[in-house]
Design a protein with these regions (language model features):
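Extracytoplasmic small-molecule ligand-binding "clamshell" domains
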Residues: 53-80, 94-173, 177, 213, ...
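A ligand-binding cleft/hinge motif common to bilobed small-molecule-binding domains
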Residues: 22-39, 156, 167-178, 223-225, ...
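Flexible hinge/capping segments at coil-to-helix
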Residues: 183, 194-211
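Bacterial N-terminal signal peptides that target proteins for export
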Residues: 1-11
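A structural signal for short loop-to-beta-strand junctions that line the ligand-binding cleft
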Residues: 30-38, 42-46, 94-98, 128, ...
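Secondary-structure junction motif
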Residues: 211-229
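A bilobed periplasmic-binding-protein/Venus flytrap-type ligand-binding module shared by bacterial periplasmic
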Residues: 36-59, 190-202, 265
C-alpha cells in the first residue's frame, strides 16, 4: 500500500511539473502577425524653426548616403535598406557657411525603440540612430550628447533650448509648422499587429476593441486609416516591448508599430 501511495504521488508530481512546464512554454512561444498597413511616412530630423543646423545635418546625411553608410546601417539593424535620403557627394562644400569644428550638441532621442534607439546597461545609447549620429559627428568634427525626450513634446523641447535637434523614429508631421525638418532619411510604414492565434484578421474586425500605441505618430496612423472612430479605446505604453507584452497578455487586442522594426519583435 505504501509503495502504491508513493507511486501515485510520483505520478501526480510528474503530471503537475509537466503542466507547469508546458504552460510556461506556451507563454514563451506566443507569436504575432501583421494584419494591415495603416500609412507610410519618412523619418526626419527636427530642428528649431529656421536653425542653420538643419542644412548642415542634411548635407552631412547626403554625403553619408552617397558613401553608402546609411544603407549599410539600415541593412545591419533592420535587415533591409529603407534609405530615402538623397545621395550627394561633397554636399557640405556647397553650404554658404561651413560648420565650425568642436561644437557639442544635445540630441533628443527615444528610448526603448530597439533596434533604432535604446539605452544600454551602462547608460549609453545604441542602435541605428546613435550609430548614424556618430558618423555625422565625425564628419563635422562635433560631439553629441543624447537626452531622452517624449516624441510628442519635440517642439517644446526645441523651443526651450533643452535640445538642439530631435532625431527619432518619427516624421514629426504634427510639428512641421513649428520646427524645421530635414528631408526624409528612412522610409517606414505603420503596421497593425495582433497575436497569431487571434481571431482578428482585418482592421475592420477590431471595431470596439483596445489598441496599444506608444506615441502620437501611431495615433495619427490610426486617424489616417479611419480606425480611430471605430476602435473602443487606445492605450498608451512606454515602449514597444511594453506594447508587445500587453498584447501577449491579452491586455489589448492589437498594437500599432513601426514596420521597419516589426521583424525585431515578431
Amino acid at each position: 500500500m505504501k509503495k502504491l501511495r508513493r507511486f501515485l504521488a510520483f505520478v501526480l508530481c510528474a503530471a503537475l511539473c509537466f503542466l507547469l512546464l508546458t504552460g510556461c512554454g506556451s507563454r514563451d512561444t506566443i507569436r504575432f502577425k501583421m494584419i494591415a498597413e495603416l500609412n507610410q511616412e519618412e523619418f526626419c530630423v527636427a530642428f528649431r524653426k529656421g536653425d542653420p543646423l538643419c542644412d548642415i545635418f542634411t548635407a552631412a546625411l547626403k554625403e553619408l548616403s552617397a558613401d553608402g553608410q546609411i544603407s549599410r546601417l539600415s541593412a545591419q539593424y533592420l535587415g533591409t535598406d529603407y534609405t530615402c535620403m538623397e545621395a550627394l557627394p561633397g554636399a557640405l562644400q556647397l553650404l554658404e557657411t561651413q560648420p565650425e569644428p568642436g561644437r557639442k550638441l544635445r540630441i533628443g532621442v527615444q528610448d526603448g525603440i530597439a533596434p533604432i534607439s535604446s539605452s544600454r546597461d551602462d547608460g549609453s545609447f545604441g542602435g541605428l540612430i546613435p550609430d548614424l549620429a556618430q558618423l555625422v559627428a565625425e564628419k563635422l568634427g562635433w560631439t553629441f550628447e543624447y537626452m531622452v525626450i517624449n516624441s510628442d513634446n519635440v517642439a517644446a523641447e526645441l523651443g526651450s533650448g533643452n535640445i538642439d535637434c530631435a532625431w527619432m523614429a518619427a516624421s514629426f508631421s504634427g510639428s512641421s509648422s513649428s520646427v524645421s525638418l530635414s528631408p526624409g532619411w528612412l522610409r517606414n510604414t505603420h503596421e497593425l499587429v495582433v497575436r497569431s492565434d487571434s481571431r482578428y484578421a482585418r482592421k475592420n474586425s477590431l471595431k470596439g476593441k483596445v489598441i496599444g500605441i506608444t506615441d502620437a505618430t501611431a495615433l495619427s496612423a490610426l486617424k489616417e486609416s479611419g480606425m480611430d472612430a471605430k476602435v473602443g479605446s487606445v492605450w498608451y505604453y512606454d515602449d514597444l516591448s511594453a506594447c508587445f507584452a500587453a498584447l501577449a497578455a491579452g491586455d489589448c487586442d492589437a498594437v500599432v508599430i513601426d514596420g521597419i522594426v516589426s521583424g525585431y519583435y515578431m
